[in-house]
């Protein structure tokens, strides 16, 4: 699979040839992250920190709150590792500082060891110094102590003339069961397919920036189909992961969906089909994922109105639970019925605040299992009203919790002193 890359220097997204010559200035990295993150994790590399020439910590910390990113560049000690993990980096990328002693202190699954190579030797200091370490020997030494490798063939980086597939195959074999991502020169769907077949991901920058490769073509490259028409089943889910229905995609609809940020599919009768174009039940595309067998897509969407042609939320009828309640409360906020208690809470913040405090106290005092569940339901309702009043959602709360789970430094769980 593809891992889009954003290299940052001086607050701007740059593309360099062999890590030195500036070939392209893509400007503000934020729009790039928004575009790239639809297909999964994005690698964000601090070029300045890697070279020891300043850093872009503030900007990259902000990017950690926007998407799942792998952060690399200048991470050389345990304090820097923990700092980035606490800031919400899904993974950290460590270069020549990745010693067994350092790796033992970190959550293995969230550490990628970067091995930048030229002529089979490992480089350091932002690709400017050659070490005596052999690439394959280094992989074998560290493979049981990290969650993955990022191997960059520096002599191919930025040229878009192809990567070293032979050396990539050797790296994957040396890594054993540890995942490998290859960077340097990858620019065609064929290379992505070959790398996927040998069990490696591809980190791609220049080819995406220049338009030589699209995100849609990158995903399509690894997909296969046993259907006569070559279509890929596409499971459509909402932000909560609730299945809305099943559709089909081809390369054209996949590319169009990613480029436009909408739910676009392939209809066997109508060809390329934009969901909601006639019905108004439109979709905002949030994520595209490929399953483990490479034969099914999953689109995560924000669905407006019902997904099914019958008007129901899903093709299996109406959904239920908290997400449905949240949508109902949002509807009341937009068009409040005159006698609605929810509408009253939305227009009287002091009343809502009092009810939240009251229900939280009742939940804290509850002791019996059923009583606890009942009080939790009461509190959850008022919590959802509070979120609705703020124009926010439970999904936003989940995002915060997901990021907090990534922290490796924990604060003590103490009671706040009571006010006198």
Protein language model features and the residues they cover:
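Conserved anion-binding
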Residues: 8-22, 82-157
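Catalytic domains of carbohydrate-active enzymes, especially glycoside hydrolases
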Residues: 31-45, 87, 142-149
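Glycine-rich, proline-tolerant flexible connector loops at the mouths of alpha/beta enzymes
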Residues: 41-58, 151-160
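Hydrophobic faces of well-ordered beta-strands that scaffold small-molecule active sites
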Residues: 2-8, 42-45, 69-73, 92-94, ...
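Catalytic cores of alpha/beta
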Residues: 58-92, 101-103, 166-202
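Flexible "arm" and connector segments at domain edges
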Residues: 107, 128-136, 181, 196-197, ...
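Charged helix-capping and loop-helix junction motifs
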Residues: 25, 54-60, 128-137, 161-170
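Short catalytic helix/loop segments, enriched in acidic residues and glycine
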Residues: 18-36
């Amino acid at each position: 699979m593809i891992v889009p890359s954003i290299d940052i220097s001086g607050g701007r997204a740059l593309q360099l040839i062999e890590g030195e010559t500036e070939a392209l200035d893509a400007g503000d990295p934020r729009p790039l992250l928004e575009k790239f993150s639809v297909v999964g994790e994005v690698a964000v590399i601090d070029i300045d920190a890697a070279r020891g020439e300043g850093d872009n910590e503030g900007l990259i910390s902000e990017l950690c709150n926007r998407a799942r990113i792998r952060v690399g560049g200048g991470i050389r000690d345990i304090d820097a590792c923990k700092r980035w993990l606490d800031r919400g980096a899904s993974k950290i990328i460590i270069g020549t500082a990745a010693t067994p002693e350092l790796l033992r202190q970190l959550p293995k699954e969230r550490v990628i060891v970067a091995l930048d190579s030229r002529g089979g030797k490992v480089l350091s200091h932002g690709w400017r110094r050659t070490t005596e370490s052999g690439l394959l020997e280094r992989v074998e030494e560290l493979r049981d102590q990290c969650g993955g490798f990022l191997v960059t063939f520096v002599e191919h980086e930025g040229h878009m003339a192809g990567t070293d597939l032979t050396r990539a195959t050797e790296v994957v074999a040396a890594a054993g069961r540890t995942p490998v991502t290859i960077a340097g020169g990858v620019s065609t769907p064929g290379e992505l397919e070959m790398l996927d077949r040998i069990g490696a991901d591809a980190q791609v920058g220049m080819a995406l920036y220049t338009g030589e490769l699209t995100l849609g073509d990158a995903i399509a490259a690894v997909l296969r189909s046993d259907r006569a028409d070559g279509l890929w089943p596409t499971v459509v889910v909402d932000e909560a992961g609730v299945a809305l229905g099943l559709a089909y995609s081809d390369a054209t609809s996949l590319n169009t969906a990613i480029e436009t940020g909408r739910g676009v599919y392939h209809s066997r009768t109508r060809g390329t089909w934009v969901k909601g174009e006639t019905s108004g039940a439109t979709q905002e595309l949030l994520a595209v994922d490929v399953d483990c067998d490479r034969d099914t897509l999953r689109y995560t969407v924000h669905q407006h109105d019902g997904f099914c042609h019958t008007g129901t939320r899903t093709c299996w009828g109406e959904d239920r639970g908290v997400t449905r309640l949240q949508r109902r409360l949002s509807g009341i906020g937009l068009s409040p019925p005159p006698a609605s208690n929810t509408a009253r809470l939305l227009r009287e913040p002091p009343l809502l605040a009092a009810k939240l405090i009251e229900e939280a106290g009742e939940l804290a005092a509850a002791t019996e299992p059923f009583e606890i569940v009942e009080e939790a339901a009461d509190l959850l309702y008022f919590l959802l009203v509070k979120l609705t009043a703020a124009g926010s959602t439970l999904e936003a709360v989940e995002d915060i919790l997901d990021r907090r789970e990534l922290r490796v430094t924990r604060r003590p769980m103490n009671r706040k002193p009571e006010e006198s």
